Amino acid sequence: MIAKKPFIQKLSDRIVVNVENSIVSAGNSAMDVLERSPGVNIDQNDVISLKGKAGVIIMIDGKPSPMTGVDLANYLRGLPSATIERIEIITNPSAKYDAAGNSGIIDIRMKKDQRIGVNGTFTAGYGQGIYPKANTGTTFNYRTKKINVFGNYNYAYRVGLNHLLLDRNFYESGVYNGGDLKDNYSTSPFSSNATRLGMDFFPNKKTIIGFVLNGNFNHYTRNNNNSSIVINPQKQAINTFNSRATNNDHGNNVLGNFNFKHTFDSTGKELTADVDYGVYNSSSLTVNSTRYYKLDGSSLQPDYTLNGDQDGELTFKTAKVDYVNPLKKGAKWEAGFKTSFVSSDNDAKFFDVSSGTPQNDVNKTNHFLYHENNNAAYLNASKEFKKFSLQVGLRGEQTNIKTEQRIGNVNFDSTYFQLFPSAFFNYKIKEDQTLGLSVSRRIDRPGYSQLNPFLFLIDVTTYATGRPGLLPQLTWSYELSYTLKNLNFTASYSHTINNQNIAIAKFRDAFPNIPSAENVTVQIPINLASSDYVGIGIAAPVRINNWWNMINNGNLYYEKFNGSLGGTNLQKGRPVADIRTNNSFTFKKGWSAELNANLNTGAQYGFMVLDPQWGIAVGVQKAILKNKGTLRFNVSDIFWTNLPKAVITYNNYIEKWHAYRETRVANLTFNYRFGSNKIPAARRRTTASEEERQRAN
């Protein structure tokens, strides 16, 4: 029997989710795996949070993705779990990492074959929920003593579902002033072609020179059907309207990386360098038509049709250098420098074609340019003693921002410098007992889409927009940990200022110069004054017997938000319990199985309160073809209960929503491995573009 790593491991500074050995993860996407990872939650807008705190940096092999929002969600949905080795969850990173990420870092580590000779894998899978999903891919690796050439190609096709029910209620001075009931059914066929090609060259035993080229090409169609019933102040239905929207989106993302590593001597003194250049292009064609009806089904007013043509380009250039210098008696210091340049160009043209003749909609047409330069330097010092270890670090980051809104000639410039100290202390009480303490200061800059002032039409009563003046949020985080044998306990506290949140405002209040109907809303990012977070956690692996292993993770936390919006003061929080268990079973003749379960008692995010959610996933695996192949079958959320539901409350507005998604999916996956089994020492690359790739678009 070959031992394998558990699905979830709790290390001293991070949680590791070993995806490649997970049965229930087979055939799923990276997004699906994240949703089942300890402390990770994903809301109805695809915003990823960690232990109830938003502001997570998603990294791919140490490189933060420049994508955010819908684009990041689409990328993760198109990334098959078969290409992922593990996911590392780091809640309190050191000064060596970019200071971005209010709640920490989630680093998705891709598979990279380390065997000598020609090696590879082939994977094919099919999934069925309400709609089909399929993926196939191959990886190859050719390694000698002088070179290592590697690459992969993956194709994914998925049809997503989001059936959203909304009950919106408006108030004036505490008196009900009407509202509407919405039934929004959205399907989203999505296809992705992802490629990766790289080479490492070993001119001598001390030097490695490498490059990696990544390409991701997506096609995403959103078909949205919305039926709305309009309610008057007397709580009577007075009319209806139906909206149909189709978005035809394309995304072409290319990223190149050059890297260098030189080890000076056997003590571990080394110099590494990375240079990245990436271009992300996107285009979207939109058709949004609305018909208005009286209650008897006759026409109420002329139809409204809006066509949109949006193009975007994001380019980023980053470079970084890191130096590690071990000293005598367990001491070490590290230093590094990084610079990055990001440019975003978004051009949106909208036309009212209700009359049959296209007319430019000047309130929605826009052209927005964004330029950002970040310069950072850090210094870390650490020392190992007999019973304890200490690490202190300081990182400085300067940010220069320039925006240009060409229509309306509105410009915004900003420059700021911030220091980000960090400290880590570990004390070995006994051989099987360890005490740890960490503190760090971090920043969460707005995503590029949050800064874009475009006015996006969701339906005729719902819009979304961004704010160029949105401030970054700053967080002080503290964590105390205690490890006893296999048990790990944590207690954490954080204080955040300028807390970023999505608010819902009346359109007339946000855009008084643009004519609108009475009960029209706009989703807009805001800065709350602050938030405070306190939590405790436990990780408890249990070996029931030689064929049954259990890993239990629990987090209990409370987050309080402070701020105000439009006369609504927010001084609220609520306790939340997030509990997850993973059970793995190993049987004879190559059979194994998994059972996972999760429970979240419901959290508060600013003005929104979520209901409890829970789910169970099961899977079974059989080793075949002389252990070179595996066949896996799993079903996620078998009772279809892991569905978000929430209430959003302001003084003049209350919204209740319930989202039905395709969380229950049955997957069948086949994987075959070929080639040599001789494995040399592995090399893992991290590169320069650490924050930029997270915030794109």
Which positions does each model-derived feature cover?
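N-terminal periplasmic accessory domains that precede
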Residues: 30-33, 72-74, 89, 101-123, ...
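Short acidic/polar hinge/loop motifs at secondary-structure boundaries
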Residues: 64-91
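Face-selective signature of the C-terminal outer-membrane beta-barrel domain
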Residues: 194-218, 243-404, 428, 432, ...
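Outer membrane beta-barrel strand-and-loop segments of large Gram-negative receptors
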Residues: 307, 316-320, 361-366, 471, ...
